[in-house]
Amino acid sequence: MKRSVLPLVGTAFQQGKMKEAIEQIQDTDLAEIARGERYYFSAQAGACAEAVKNYLTSEDLMLRLSADMLYAFANLTLGNAREAQMAREDVRNCLQKSLEEDVTDETKAACIFACYLSSIFLHIEPEKGIPPLETCINHLPEGQRLFAVSVLAHGMYLKKEYAKAQGVVQTAMLLSDQVYPIPFIYLHCIAAMCQINQKDQEGAIRSVTRAWELAHADQLMEPFIEYHGLLQGVLEVCLRKSEPETYKKLVDGIIAFSRGWMKIHNPQMNTMVTDLLTPLEFSIAMLACRDWTNQEIAEHLGLSVNTVKHYVSAILEKLHLDAITPAP
């Protein structure tokens, strides 16, 4: 069997059948990586790190890159910034090696994809000199290619190219021959991020609902944990009242992940993303920064205007601010 990076990401398994899909992988090393993916995407960071750590020094680049990415992101949640950064640096070393040696286009594409993922995911610009991801994305298998499209679209989102990013992810899903649950969850979430920034609340809610329909049977909660802040309250609208226990689990994951994320993002970008706010407060602050009125925020989140005012006052007090300034 030809190995590829992140095998579970590239598997079109039926909803609720993720474990069975892993059991069908005959390559024992790929199966172990897939188990690590299962742990990661179901928000079991400790189990993920344990499952993949033996592959961090593998001679097989597909196994090593997979382990690096999973280990880096799992350690964000675990609060181990040093371990996460070391895994990110190894991805860069693998890419450099692939550019210097005669490797297949598929291997080079996997290295470039891993580099972009480990940077854009943290809102860090990829290093100069790295080949553009779009020039090699066609060398990835379909499922991994769809996941790479989500990374490209995330980069567009960070440049505030919301309509373009939304078009890219929706087109990618339309053109896919099969439903790949993990990439599709990310693509739907990015569509929602773009829609809410264009004040298309109904569209954003539909996108998150579709993502959750793909995720809930296998408890694939990690994408929602990662994108919570950028979803700007849509997750609260979809789950806070209808599935309170699930939302509580997500909140616990959001707090742990965001603190680890900031440990790498803030020093690298010389910016300070705060960890003083609760997830709901952060969502309200994000909306206020984008010039939403208290009335609009209240209607979006299903709260009273007075409740929103109370939250805004608490946010200002925690951040020692006089007012929330709209984002440029």
Model regions and ranges:
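Helix-turn-helix repeat elements of alpha-solenoid scaffolds
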Residues: 3-25, 37-54, 76-95, 119-133, ...
